[in-house]
């Protein structure tokens, strides 16, 4: 990868602007999950240890450009960052035209989405950002799929543009999983709709050895194979697409194993009566809400023999206890597997937390939309810009 790495640079006495993803949930001024702040600390500490004058910025929510509001302010983040770093972290409100910061100090620059032109990747604004620093560090993988002034434009104009440790760890893990995977490569793609994961399925089917589909996506594939799905969530108009994906897999010698048993209910409710049925016994008024125990075991065996596992999406309605066993079985199989494993997506991370397997998954992507776009085979604007600067 041709990207300059922050870890390789001499930052002594340099003004370093770091774009982090500090977009944390805040309720009544209280941060409810500080994972992203905690994740940013090693990068900031490293820059300080290298003797840099450090400026950090991030977006928070979706404020209106050109107007400051308390609810969109990074003030609570500055307070928490100071506590984690053990140093003062002043919040600078008006910073586009210049920032006072000395080597060994760190300042937090107010929500960059408040700046006029940020969202449209305005060149004038990007050049102003670039003029603030000697080195720009992009460390926000979660926004790498957005071409904005603080994630893309500034990379073009900064004297030096580098990838930060968080961003590079994410790119290294994804490259290891997709570009040069230990075989067999198994992907789990689940979600409510084929339509939202169509590009993902179409890209992965050309790379994987096994593709496990789950949730509403699986129902469409089950229907495509000629089985009844009752009143389960599915997309009949995408049956030809599902058949094409299966045909593409077959042509490569890859496999899309379908469930042989499922867990059904008559209503979509947490306390609905759950029944395990073989796939050919699904009634017209049944809702398929999870994979059955035999299927879960079969999938777990595939995971056990995989060299690489990419996991995006729970295979059942795991929020409801009666329909969580399929997802739990696969989660525990991934945890005990020797495979290189990468998990990403909001619901997937919730499942990782629920079954407490974060330590056992090789790499957990916090990228969200950027993670999905990478899996879809798309070029992320920030990554492309960093690669262009690294040539």
Curated annotation (Swiss-Prot):
Signal peptide: none
SUPFAM superfamilies: Phosphoglycerate kinase (SSF53748)
Catalytic EC class: transferase
Transmembrane segment boundaries: none
UniProt keyword list: ATP-binding, Cytoplasm, Glycolysis, Kinase, Nucleotide-binding, Transferase
Residues the entry annotates as binding substrate: 21-23, 36, 59-62, 113, 146
Gene Ontology MF annotations: ADP binding; ATP binding; phosphoglycerate kinase activity
InterPro entries: Phosphoglycerate_kinase, Phosphoglycerate_kinase_CS, Phosphoglycerate_kinase_N, Phosphoglycerate_kinase_sf
Main location: cytoplasm
Gene3D superfamilies: Phosphoglycerate kinase, N-terminal domain (3.40.50.1260)
Residue positions binding ATP: 197, 319, 345-348
Recorded catalytic activity of this chain's protein: (2R)-3-phosphoglycerate + ATP = (2R)-3-phospho-glyceroyl phosphate + ADP
One Gene Ontology cellular component annotation held by this UniProt entry: cytosol
Record's subcellular location: Cytoplasm
An annotated GO BP: gluconeogenesis
Quaternary structure (record): Monomer.
Family (UniProt): Belongs to the phosphoglycerate kinase family.
Name of the molecule in the record: Phosphoglycerate kinase
Organism whose genome encodes this protein: Xanthomonas euvesicatoria pv. vesicatoria (strain 85-10) (Xanthomonas campestris pv. vesicatoria)
Organism classification: Bacteria, Pseudomonadati, Pseudomonadota, Gammaproteobacteria, Lysobacterales
């Amino acid at each position: 990868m041709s990207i300059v790495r922050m870890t390789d640079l001499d930052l002594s006495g340099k003004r370093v602007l770091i774009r982090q993803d500090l977009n944390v949930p805040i309720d009544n001024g209280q941060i409810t999950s500080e994972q992203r702040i905690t994740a940013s600390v090693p990068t900031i500490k490293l820059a300080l240890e290298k003797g840099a004058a450090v400026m950090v910025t991030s977006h928070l929510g979706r404020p209106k450009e050109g107007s400051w509001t308390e609810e969109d302010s990074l003030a609570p983040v500055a307070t928490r960052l100071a506590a984690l770093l053990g140093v003062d972290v002043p919040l600078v409100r008006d910073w586009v035209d210049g920032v006072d910061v000395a080597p060994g100090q760190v300042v937090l620059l107010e929500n960059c989405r408040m700046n006029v032109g940020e969202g449209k990747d305005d060149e004038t604004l990007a050049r102003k950002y670039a003029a603030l620093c000697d080195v720009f560090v992009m460390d926000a993988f979660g926004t790498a799929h957005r071409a904005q002034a603080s994630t893309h434009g500034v990379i073009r104009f900064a004297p030096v543009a580098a990838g930060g440790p968080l961003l590079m760890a994410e790119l290294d893990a994804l490259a290891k999983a997709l570009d040069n995977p230990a075989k067999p490569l198994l992907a789990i793609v689940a979600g409510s709709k084929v339509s939202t994961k169509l590009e993902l399925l179409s890209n992965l089917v050309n790379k994987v050895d096994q593709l496990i589909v789950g949730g509403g996506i699986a129902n469409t594939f089950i229907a495509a194979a000629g089985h009844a799905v009752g009143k389960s969530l599915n997309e009949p108009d995408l049956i030809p697409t599902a058949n094409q994906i299966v045909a593409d897999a077959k042509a490569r010698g890859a496999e899309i194993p379908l469930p042989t048993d499922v867990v059904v209910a008559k209503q979509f409710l947490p306390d609905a009566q759950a029944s395990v049925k073989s796939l050919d016994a699904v009634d017209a008024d049944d809702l398929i809400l999870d994979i059955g125990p035999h299927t879960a075991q079969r999938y777990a065996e595939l995971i056990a023999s995989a060299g690489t596992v990419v996991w995006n999406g729970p295979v059942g309605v795991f929020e409801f206890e009666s329909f969580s066993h399929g997802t739990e079985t696969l989660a525990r199989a991934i945890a005990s597997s020797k495979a290189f494993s990468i998990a990403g997506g909001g619901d997937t991370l919730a499942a990782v937390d629920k079954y407490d397997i974060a330590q056992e998954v090789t790499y957990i992507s916090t990228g969200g939309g950027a993670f999905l776009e990478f899996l879809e085979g798309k070029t992320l604007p920030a990554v492309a810009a960093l690669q262009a600067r690294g040539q």
